[in-house]
Amino acid sequence: MASGEDGPRSCMVCGDRATGYHFHALTCEGCKGFFRRTVSKNTGLTCPFAGNCKVNKAQRRHCPACRLQKCLDAGMKKEMILSAEALVQRRAKQAQRRAQWAPVQLSKGQQELVQTLLGAHARHVGTMFDQFVQFRPPAHLFIHHQRLPIPVPALPLLKHFAEVNTFMVQEVIKFTKDLPLFRSLPMEDQISLLKGAAVEICHIALNTTFCLQTRNFLCGPLCYALEDGVHVGFQEEFLELLFRFHATLRRLQLQEPEYVLMAAMALFSPDRPGVTRREEIDRLQEVTALTLQSYIKGQPPRPRDRFLYAKLLGLLAELRSIDNAYGYQIQHIQGLSAMMPLLQEICS
């Protein structure tokens, strides 16, 4: 399975690997630095070869004039470069914010909640991906195509997928049953919450195995690519949406407490069909949400923390839409529903 992106992007100036948009154009770090230095110095540059020099990764240093012109042609804007004075002021403000940062301490109750979630996660979810190899995977799933010794024949990909997904849902159910707050709810509400959140929690946990470089899921010795999902029978458009979600979430570089709190927020959703104690479940979700907010605020400032809580709320909403689409896909893949009645029940 691959992400929804098209792989590494190229610098619009020299063709090297781009690191992002700099001064309004997609460029590499080298061309970003060159443009800033050249514009800041404000020196007149002249090409000795009539302005026809080739600018690529190997030759970009040969003619500064042509390189600057190509920067401008690519859309880089001089007015976006801060003056030396403005740059000093910005760095001073950043340093001041770091100096003024005071960590938010979790309350005793919040600490206990985090520890309970982490403990249940470690017992039931943390190691489940390494166990996928027990479900007789096809040979091509092994990393580097090097098979491990398995005493029984491999399963077809569809059957392997069904068994792995059933196993994940079973472990997620054990995870939730290990949470006192969840067990305190009536059984009918536990069932309703699990039917709504089990697949979402699976994907939150699965995100820890997603590799941004390869756009694959690395589960122990196994590697799952987008093409595997296509072979199972999922629509490629759905898989691209799913992989784009995982890439976005993975880039946030969440810590384990943030992952488990995100999973708990998905679990304690008071708007799931069939729940009876909506106010109580709403209170549990609020407690979880406030704990997540406090945990994020308690970490040293990092660029990825900017609006992190709001980003996670948006991703939870997106995940719910993906879950609905996933249920539809499961119903329409021939023979799959019969192979995993537990997931069929959850998605119904």
UniProtKB/Swiss-Prot annotation:
Q: Taxonomically, which superkingdom?
A: Eukaryota
Q: Which residue numbers delimit the NR LBD domain?
A: 109-348
Reported modifications of this chain: Phosphorylated at Thr-38 by PKC, dephosphorylation of Thr-38 is required for nuclear translocation and activation.
Arranged from A to Z, the UniProt key words for this protein are: Activator, Cytoplasm, Cytoskeleton, DNA-binding, Metal-binding, Nucleus, Phosphoprotein, Receptor, Transcription, Transcription regulation, Zinc, Zinc-finger
DNA-binding region(s), residue ranges:
8-83
Q: Which residues carry this modification: Phosphothreonine?
A: T38
MF (Gene Ontology): nuclear receptor activity; RNA polymerase II cis-regulatory region sequence-specific DNA binding; zinc ion binding
**Looking at the Swiss-Prot or TrEMBL record, what is one Pfam family this protein matches?**
zf-C4
Membrane-spanning ranges: none
Gene3D superfamilies according to UniProt: Erythroid Transcription Factor GATA-1, subunit A, Retinoid X Receptor
A single cellular component GO annotation: cytoplasm
- The answer to whether keyword Phosphoprotein applies is yes
- InterPro entries from the entry? NHR-like_dom_sf, Nucl_hrmn_rcpt_lig-bd, Nuclear_hormone_rcpt_NR1, Nuclear_hrmn_rcpt, Znf_hrmn_rcpt, Znf_NHR/GATA
- Where on this chain are zinc fingers (NR C4-type) annotated? 11-31, 47-71
- Main location per UniProt? nucleus
One biological process term in Gene Ontology: negative regulation of transcription by RNA polymerase II
Which cell locations does it reside in? Nucleus; Cytoplasm; Cytoplasm, Cytoskeleton
Q: Which family does it belong to?
A: Belongs to the nuclear hormone receptor family. NR1 subfamily.
Its job: Binds and transactivates the retinoic acid response elements that control expression of the retinoic acid receptor beta 2 and alcohol dehydrogenase 3 genes. Transactivates both the phenobarbital responsive element module of the human CYP2B6 gene and the CYP3A4 xenobiotic response element.
Domain notes, please? Composed by a short N-terminal domain followed by the DNA binding, hinge, and ligand binding/dimerization domains.
Describe its partners and assembly state: Heterodimer of NR1I3 and RXR. Interacts with PSMC4. Interacts with ECT2. Directly interacts with DNAJC7; this complex may also include HSP90. Interacts with CRY1. Interacts with CRY2 in a ligand-dependent manner.
Name of the protein described by the UniProt record = Nuclear receptor subfamily 1 group I member 3
What phylogenetic lineage does the species belong to?
A: Eukaryota, Metazoa, Chordata, Craniata, Vertebrata
Q: Gene symbol?
A: NR1I3
